[in-house]
Structure formats: structure tokens, C-alpha cells
């Protein structure tokens, strides 16, 4: 099992991730992103700019219920990769199976969102001192 340990800022829980195309499992081309960990989200999401830079094909708009209400947003297939503690930039990330996720609208604090589709494959813990731990693999 691999793990990531970090501290959150007291307002939101974010961590670095890598976003990859889902159409070819041998294509390890990625974009770095900062992901919000959201236990209230059913599915994961990526910023529209990431989808465009990776050349992801839209799967159409679908309804999305969020804290801001009901809206319609583009859907994409993508993969999320996590770099375990102790790995260097030359290491390969742990890559989860493809997600059927949604397009985020611009946030200045994060460019991806990790929802329960990914978190249910992990052990996630947070303590009173703002330390977070994510175990996966």
C-alpha cells in the first residue's frame, strides 16, 4: 500500500494530483493539478482548461447537483494519479481506473476534485492537528 501524508490549511483539504487521458492506458501523458478532497461529491471532476489541454472529448452535458444548486456540466473520462510519499519526479504515479467525471468551473484554489468514486478505494483520515493521511493501492 502507498500513502500520502500532508496538512490542510484549515479551510479546504487539497493535494497534488496528476490528470491523465483515459482512452489509452499506455499513454502516461499527464497534467499536474491541485485537487480538492470532497467527501460530499459522488464523482470526481477536472477544470475545463485541463480537459482542453489534454484534448479530452466531451461526453455531453449532464445534470449536476452541487452546493450551488442544480446545473448542467460537461462530462469527461479521465484518470487520476497520486504520487506516494517518498517518490521523486521520475517515479510513476499510482493511477486509478478511469473516472466518468464532470467539468469544474474556475476556482482559484483547485483545478480538480476528488470525489467518492476515488475515495472509496482509499483509507482517508484527518486528525485534530490538521494532519491528513490517504492510503491507496
Segments from the language model and where they lie:
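Pepsin/retropepsin-fold aspartyl endopeptidases
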Residues: 1-137
Amino acid at each position: 500500500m502507498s500513502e500520502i501524508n500532508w496538512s490542510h490549511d484549515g479551510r479546504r483539504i487539497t493535494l497534488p494530483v496528476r490528470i491523465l487521458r483515459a482512452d489509452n492506458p499506455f499513454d502516461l501523458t499527464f497534467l499536474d493539478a491541485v485537487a480538492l478532497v470532497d467527501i460530499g461529491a459522488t464523482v470526481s471532476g477536472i477544470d475545463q482548461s485541463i480537459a482542453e489541454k489534454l484534448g479530452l472529448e466531451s461526453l455531453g452535458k449532464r445534470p449536476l447537483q452541487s452546493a450551488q444548486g442544480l446545473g448542467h456540466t460537461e462530462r469527461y473520462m479521465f484518470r487520476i494519479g497520486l504520487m506516494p510519499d517518498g517518490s521523486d519526479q521520475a517515479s510513476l504515479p499510482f493511477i486509478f481506473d478511469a473516472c466518468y467525471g464532470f467539468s469544474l468551473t474556475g476556482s482559484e484554489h483547485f483545478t480538480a476534485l476528488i470525489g467518492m468514486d476515488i475515495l472509496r478505494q482509499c483509507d482517508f483520515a484527518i486528525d485534530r492537528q490538521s494532519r491528513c493521511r490517504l492510503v491507496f493501492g
